């Protein structure tokens, strides 16, 4: 990338490999990696950046495959200036870089129930963008509003209703960067909330490959059977049962593998490339389609050049 970019107060690194910033440890470099110092730095940089240059907001890489050819343009990764957590009254305000688990714990200490966030990997910005959820509770159930910086550097406050949440979906425009989210939370006893989170962690560890290198659930549950908080919240059919029925539990392609413990988890079992991970995922989709007629949709975000 040869364009001249604005000079920020934060860090701007050319040709920065991204593999070490993703949970799967795969992927090529970003043309540029921008880590803004604070909100004003982010807004000024985007306002001055050539509109033709693409931007990709990246969280902690917990639900992401960066392809081996890397990402064009500027990857934006928020850090310390965006991880504050404040609890006041019945609300919790969290910076987009705050980890979901940290927000859940801080809220519980303040006697506020956001326990559903405890077992969700990743940070608040990504959780808002994809309406993350666990055990039948979703970001959409608690979100009041978000603050975000648009691609042109303008600052916006968006009510939760305007994000039009669906299953693993929000209408947040491409290139907009969430910087803060405000949640409503019911009161609860801190000790009881802490105990509930410990139970959730034990339940997760018993059923998911939490010690392996994965990006969480690979595929969405089939439409009409997925938990959305609406009438179709039936939980009668899960992606993992379709993968298992297709005989793909533990299936391997190069260094990529579908987990033996939970077949909807795609693993880097050792030395995998992004191409191998994506190819195994597509093989799973094809086999499930052939054996069940269901079309699995990726939940893991795949981005970049092959």
Curated annotation (Swiss-Prot):
Compartments where located: Cytoplasm
Region (Disordered) residue spans: 199-232
Catalytic residue list: 168, 217, 299
GO molecular function, one term: UDP-N-acetylmuramate dehydrogenase activity
Pfam family, one: FAD_binding_4
Cofactor: FAD
InterPro entries: FAD-bd_PCMH, FAD-bd_PCMH-like_sf, FAD-bd_PCMH_sub1, FAD-bd_PCMH_sub2, MurB, MurB_C, MurB_C_sf, Oxid_FAD_bind_N
Swiss-Prot/TrEMBL keywords: Cell cycle, Cell division, Cell shape, Cell wall biogenesis/degradation, Cytoplasm, FAD, Flavoprotein, NADP, Oxidoreductase, Peptidoglycan synthesis
Similarity section: Belongs to the MurB family.
Role played: Cell wall formation.
Name under which the protein is recorded: UDP-N-acetylenolpyruvoylglucosamine reductase
Source organism (scientific name): Paracoccus denitrificans (strain Pd 1222)
The organism's taxonomic lineage, starting at the top: Bacteria, Pseudomonadati, Pseudomonadota, Alphaproteobacteria, Rhodobacterales
Gene name as annotated: murB
């Amino acid at each position: 990338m040869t364009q001249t970019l604005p000079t920020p107060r934060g860090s701007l690194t050319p040709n920065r490999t991204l593999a070490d910033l993703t949970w799967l440890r795969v992927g090529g470099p970003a043309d540029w990696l921008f880590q803004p110092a604070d909100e004003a730095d982010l807004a000024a940089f985007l306002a001055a950046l050539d509109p033709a240059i693409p931007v990709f907001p990246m969280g902690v890489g917990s639900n992401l495959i960066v392809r081996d050819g890397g990402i064009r343009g500027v990857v934006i990764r928020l850090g310390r200036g965006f991880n504050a957590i404040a609890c006041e009254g019945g609300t919790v305000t969290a910076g987009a870089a705050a980890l979901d688990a940290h927000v859940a714990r801080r809220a519980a200490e303040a006697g506020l129930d956001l326990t559903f966030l405890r077992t969700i990997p990743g940070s608040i910005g990504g959780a808002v963008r994809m309406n993350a959820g666990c055990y039948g509770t979703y970001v959409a159930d608690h979100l009041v509003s978000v603050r975000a910086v648009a691609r042109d550097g303008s600052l916006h406050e968006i009510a939760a209703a305007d994000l039009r949440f669906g299953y693993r979906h929000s209408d947040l425009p491409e290139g907009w960067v969430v910087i803060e989210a405000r949640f409503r939370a019911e009161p609860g006893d801190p000790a009881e909330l802490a105990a509930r989170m410990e139970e959730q962690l034990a339940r997760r560890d018993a059923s998911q490959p939490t010690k392996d290198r994965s990006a969480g659930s690979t595929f969405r549950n089939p439409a009409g059977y997925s938990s959305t908080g609406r009438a179709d919240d039936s939980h009668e059919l899960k992606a993992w049962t379709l993968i298992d029925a297709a005989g793909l539990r533990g299936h391997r392609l190069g260094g990529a593998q579908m987990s033996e413990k939970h077949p909807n988890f795609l693993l880097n079992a050792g030395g995998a490339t992004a191409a191998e991970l994506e190819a195994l995922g597509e093989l799973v989709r094809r086999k499930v389609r052939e054996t069940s007629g269901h079309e699995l949709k990726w939940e893991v975000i795949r981005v970049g050049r092959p």
